[in-house]
Amino acid sequence: IVIRPGVIIGGGDIFMKRLLPIFKTSFFIPLFGDGSTKFQPVFIDDVSLAVEKIITDNIEGQGIYELAGSRAISYKDFYNYISKCLNKTRVLVPTPLNLIKPIISIAEKTPFSPLTSEQLLLFEKDNIIQNIDKSFKDLEISPQDTLQITKNIIEN
């Protein structure tokens, strides 16, 4: 059995831990690419519940469990939602990926890099479940609402 989660949020995750300080302190927010790339963030508690269920229910066999959140959302829409939750006006600055790649490849060699080259790849194409082998549904789990979880993270 293979468990393949989407971008994990919650529980002090790296994604939100790096993103929120930028939104809290910067007026201009870099938007890698044009922001139309979609992703499907998943709450850590939902992933933990799925792993627990696979183990405790003694699920055997083969298969890939693609665990993704309740909705696919573009980075642009997600960033705008974060701004709204923070009650802050932010200007999203589209940044061509081919321009940012060399900068990130140098920056990631320092302790101050906001992200890695590998993480930058997530902005190149949609990161949503498509060819589902197995998912939360097969485990009788309904993933929590991604935007509500994001709002809770921001408020706490």
What is the role of each PLM region?
Residues 1-12:
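Conserved beta-loop-beta element that borders a ligand/cofactor-binding pocket
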Residues 2, 32, 133-136:
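Short glycine/proline- and acidic residue-enriched helix-loop micro-motifs
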Residues 2, 38-41, 72, 129, ...:
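Short aromatic/basic micro-patch
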Residues 13-16, 34-56, 63:
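Substrate-positioning beta->alpha
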Residues 18-40, 44, 84, 89-127:
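Alpha-helical membrane-targeting segments
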Residues 53-115, 131-156:
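Mid/C-terminal beta-alpha module of Rossmann-like enzyme folds, strongest
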